[in-house]
Amino acid sequence: MVDLFEKNEINGMTLSNRFIRSATWEGMATAEGACTPPLIDLMGDLAAGGVGLIITGHTYIREDGQHSPRQLGIHQDTLIPGLQNLTRCVHEHASKIVLQLGFGGAYLSKSRLRRMSSQDFQDLTEAYGQAALRARKAGFDGVQIFAAHGFFLSQMLCPRYNDRSDDYGGKITNRARALLEVLDGIRNAVGRNYPVLVKINCRDFVENGLTLEDSILAASMLEKAGIDAIELSGGLLNNPNIMRSKMDPEDTKGYFLSEARTFREKIQVPLILVGGIRSYEVARELVEDEVVDYIAMSRPFIREPGLIKRWRAGDRREAACISCDNCFEPIKKGEGVSCLPLEPEATETFFPQLSETVPASPPYPPGTGYKISIGLEDWQSNYIPVIKIQMALNGQILERSPSFPLGTQDHQKVTQAITDLLEKRTNIN
């Protein structure tokens, strides 16, 4: 029987167990992207709670790559001292921490969209390398390249976004070029002995998105280029099932289990699976069956930072997280991520512009539908475009974020409705 608490290594980085805190948006940095005491406290609680590896929320590697307010930055040297306080705190609790490197792409909060030139790609590759070097100087045990969920490097992999006809577009060997160049740029900056991980979508789950087959091909290229571990996720930020709420019992075995099994047949480097895992027994089974090497979780650690310590002590009850997604509500007020009870009566901060309701399929009763709204969300007086999906029965809202299996008829109908509303919104603007 596999021991999930046995020490292991990723390119010389020794971990105390096989549990990883997946990158989570904390919303606790300063307006300039600097580390803060509350963020250090949060990471310290995670480390003290027994998780083997912490991956930070995605940081921005250049000032023009910031995605959201109070996002942690790694774009300049002046940020290093504050980050050193963070890594020191984590290491005092015998845990390890990896910094996730990101760039907003089409989700940028400060830049206008434009087609990138060859020089732009070179400059961005250099910025990733310099950011990784800052991370190493700050004491991080490694870095993770963020190439999932529709952000820049994910968009490059996705035919839906990437319609280029040059060396960076077309077949997957070209669409993966930017990601491979980023990996090479990081290696040139920090060397081969510094752990470099990547987070990618196993598939995008949208029409004309990244397929499982192409994702595996991209992963194979990363493996040959010397990536140290691959974390598997799925979906785009504007996809209704990127992060499900009110999970069904089957979801607790992992959203992307079947895709992970297919990956394992082709990929030899360590695989990390995130999404929907709440049970110690499921985690043990996945590692024991050699489907993946590591288990990553996000929301369960917001609810219960000491979850791994509890499991290690012998209390193997499932994670207490109910996946209500209310943990991200405080970020809108500038308070940072935290677990809160679900409060349907909370003050509304969403201002819809367009909406449409599509009927739900059986076994839902007649009159049940998915209300899709596109509008603006008030995040500390920063109005950000948001897609909101609610389940309704005869016009009455039942769930703020319904759950349905990826690839089903309902999933396809909702995805198409989102696409149609986005086109209408573009025409209005």
What are these regions (language model features)?
Residues 1-349:
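Flavin-dependent oxidoreductase catalytic cores
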Residues 13, 104, 344, 377-379, ...:
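Generic structural motif
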Residues 13, 93, 361, 375-377, ...:
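Compositionally biased, intrinsically disordered low-complexity segments
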Residues 348-368:
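Negatively charged, low-complexity tracts enriched in Asp/Glu with abundant Ser/Thr
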Residues 368-403:
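A short, structured beta-strand/loop element
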Residues 392-429:
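Mixed-charge, Lys/Arg-enriched low-complexity segments
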